């Protein structure tokens, strides 16, 4: 089973596709979608086109998205919510459903501590998937962590 994990952001959207077979996890691909245009409509279109390319290239069975975190800048939250809405609609069209996890749930699933630092999550991602190279930026390790969290939840059910 292939799981797409997404860490949406207003400038970078981290993504990762992992394989979950026979209690074994392996990384298929990971990266980020760089949002460089300035107009909101173009940003949303670029994001959705990149997601379409990922879904066309890889046979994805499940999708997990990190939920919006609290932010002090209301404009950032609104923009992020618009991106998540566009992503959600595209995923519903292509896959049929998705799961959502809060940052606290992801951190707790990977480190056992819901208040863990991003670096601790990245360390556990590397350890669980036997990755020796550095994972940068942290949006990528966050997306991998979201996918791993979903794999763990599927295993429990």
From Swiss-Prot:
Subcellular location as annotated: Cytoplasm
Regions annotated as coiled coil: none
Class of the enzyme per the UniProt entry, highest EC level: hydrolase
Cited CDD domains: RuvC
GO aspect biological process, one term: DNA recombination
Binding positions for Mg(2+) 1 per the UniProt entry: 7, 139
InterPro entries in the record: RNaseH-like_sf, RNaseH_sf, X-over_junc_endoDNase_Mg_BS, X-over_junc_endoDNase_RuvC
Catalytic residues, chain numbering: 7, 66, 139
Superkingdom of this protein's organism: Bacteria
Keywords: Cytoplasm, DNA damage, DNA recombination, DNA repair, DNA-binding, Endonuclease, Hydrolase, Magnesium, Metal-binding, Nuclease
Keyword Cytoplasm included in the entry's annotation: yes
Database matches in PROSITE patterns: RUVC
Chain residues that bind Mg(2+) 2: 66
Molecular function terms from GO: crossover junction DNA endonuclease activity; DNA binding; magnesium ion binding
E.C. designation(s): 3.1.21.10
Binding note for cofactor: Binds 2 Mg(2+) ion per subunit.
Catalysis: reaction(s): Endonucleolytic cleavage at a junction such as a reciprocal single-stranded crossover between two homologous DNA duplexes (Holliday junction)
Annotated Gene Ontology cellular component terms: cytoplasm; Holliday junction resolvase complex
Annotated function: The RuvA-RuvB-RuvC complex processes Holliday junction (HJ) DNA during genetic recombination and DNA repair. Endonuclease that resolves HJ intermediates. Cleaves cruciform DNA by making single-stranded nicks across the HJ at symmetrical positions within the homologous arms, yielding a 5'-phosphate and a 3'-hydroxyl group; requires a central core of homology in the junction. The consensus cleavage sequence is 5'-(A/T)TT(C/G)-3'. Cleavage occurs on the 3'-side of the TT dinucleotide at the point of strand exchange.
NCBIfam families in UniProt: ruvC
Subunit structure: Homodimer which binds Holliday junction (HJ) DNA. The HJ becomes 2-fold symmetrical on binding to RuvC with unstacked arms; it has a different conformation from HJ DNA in complex with RuvA. In the full resolvosome a probable DNA-RuvA(4)-RuvB(12)-RuvC(2) complex forms which resolves the HJ.
Record family assignment: Belongs to the RuvC family.
Protein name (Swiss-Prot/TrEMBL): Crossover junction endodeoxyribonuclease RuvC
Organism, scientific name: Helicobacter pylori (strain P12)
